[in-house]
Amino acid sequence: MRQLDRRSALAQGLSEDELMIKAGGAAFRALSEKWPEAATLAVLCGRGNNGGDGWVVARLALEAGLACDVYVTGDPSDITGSAQCAHARWAAVSGSAPRPISALFSTDVALDQYDLIVDALVGIGMTHRPRPEFEDWIAALADAQSPIMSLDIPSGLSADGGPSSGAAIRADLTMTFIAPKPVLLTGPRLDHVGDLIIDPLDTPASTYREITPVALALRNEQSGWLPVRSRIAHKGSFGHVLVIGGDTGMGGAALLAAAGALRGGAGLVSLATRQCHVMAALSRYPEVMVRGIEDPSALKNLLIGKDVIVIGPGLGQDVWGQTCLEIALKTSVPVVCDADAINLIASGVVSVSGAGPRVLTPHPGEAARLAGCTVADIEADRLGSAKRLALKTESTIALKGAGTVVAAPTPDALPIICCHGNPGMATGGMGDVLAGLIGALLAQRLEPIAATAIAVGAHAEAADMAWQEQGVGLTPSDVVERLGGVLTQV
């Protein structure tokens, strides 16, 4: 991260000090826009560059006529580098010394006297578990009624999204600079981020190509990933997806997967499910060719001529589901494994290895079973977990959750983090739709990593559109109905 900061400054002909002034200025403009009525600020500054951004914000606040108190960790004389320059400029305007941060949490100071608290304590500089006094400060801030804005990342978090424990600032707004940090996009600490603003600080595009990132960010402004459809195309041009699932009582999951494949643009969609679900499936989606199978051996004929298999939604883990999965995984076409298919693979009764490409879409619990670890282990390092699972299973992985991570089964491939999605997606059936959508894009001849990444992004963006209308009442069917429009823009 620091290397990227230096290269950004160099590319723009700026000193590190000038880049810090630019970052602090952007932060002050952002807080002024979000909290225009804020007249009294408390800025918490560490002794590093994150604190330097804070000194810039504090100086600009004073120059704008706001009341602003600065609280600093340690002795201000220990501040060095560009942060020292920023501190000196603040001191020249303030005419006073900063207060020790311990004073902020004394009985003589009321936190709620401030309209806004700015966190410039550590940022990306946190490389170890916070000291006990830091944890005490965070606990006190948690009781404050004033909103908190964090600069770069909420202090206490690990920037790369790796293992992070202990206390961390819970911000209402985080403003990060030059490039997003993984911890701001994925993982169990997203509630600490609040609203997120990413300001590139005018960093040239060429600068990003000089640095090897830890991950790629998947965002809705990216386009041109899907091939343009020929005017003389026919249904065979876009592949035939076979969805297998829906054991007794679980037909809805398989039907949602089939719906995802339909709206994902597959030329043909077939569904193999229990006989008891056939009538309901045909009534809901007459476009789907539905076949009731009680004997899994009937799948062998159904597999002929299919371009992609999606298996797992509502599959169950008894003999019927296990046998269906064994047959499906013997084929050489791409197979998308979701839900119970993943659980069966994790249990060891079925091997995922096969002649064709495989895509697995585990949620954290399923990922933990695949990896033989705890859910906490998976969530503590989502990037690393997805990469390790991809290599272990020789499959493309979509590790679902807040900030879904997509990883390819090659050691040098960068994981991809989805920047979209919302809490309304935390409902049964969302993953089934995603599995069908991935299958549809595979059927259109996309490579597994591209098909999975595009599907994850489109699925999340469609859900964001539905969230604006439905809120907590969001359903997987709402997402299905918006997929076609989203994919048209990809």
List where the protein language model places each region:
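N-terminal small/polar loop signature for handling phosphorylated ligands or for N-terminal nucleophile
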Residues: 58-143, 279-292, 298-305
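Internal gly/pro-rich beta-alpha loop/helix module
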Residues: 115-116, 121-212
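Short acidic-hydrophobic sequence patches enriched in Asp/Glu that either
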Residues: 82, 133, 167-170, 429, ...
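Small-residue (G/A/S/T)-rich helix-start motifs and N-terminal tracts that mark the onset
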Residues: 1-73, 80, 184-339, 343-359, ...
